[in-house]
Amino acid sequence: MIIFTDGKINIGENNILAASNEELNSLAEEGVIEKRKDAIGTYYYLEDESQGMRFGVFISLQDRKINWVRFSWLDSPCKGWEDASQKAMMDEYRLLSNFLENQVGGLPDSKVNRKTTWRFNWGLLEVSYEPRAYQADIFMKFQ
């Protein structure tokens, strides 16, 4: 379960975002989350939902700590380049922004060029839209 206001993803009793690299490795060995590698390095992946919206969750590490988490909406109407358009991505960006406003229970602290940000004690919660990649995502960035 994703709890955006607390900066948490709970699997059972465990908050995986408070987990160490070793604990994430252990969860990957148990098959709870996936450990993946790309050109940049190792990251973890899982699928979870919040208020009926399904997300692909990418957990990026830096210096053995969680650096950021990206939430990609799995039910996006844009499944590939042939589905993508400026209007579709702006609609998705607005949908994700409104979704977070409802989840957080308040207006964002900052709204500038394709980025909407809420500030919390644990860090930042953002919705951003990258027009060159036709991608709108939610990010958690930890302090």
Where would I find each of the regions flagged by the language model?
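Short helix/turn-capping signatures at newly exposed starts of structured segments
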Residues: 1-116, 122-125, 130-143
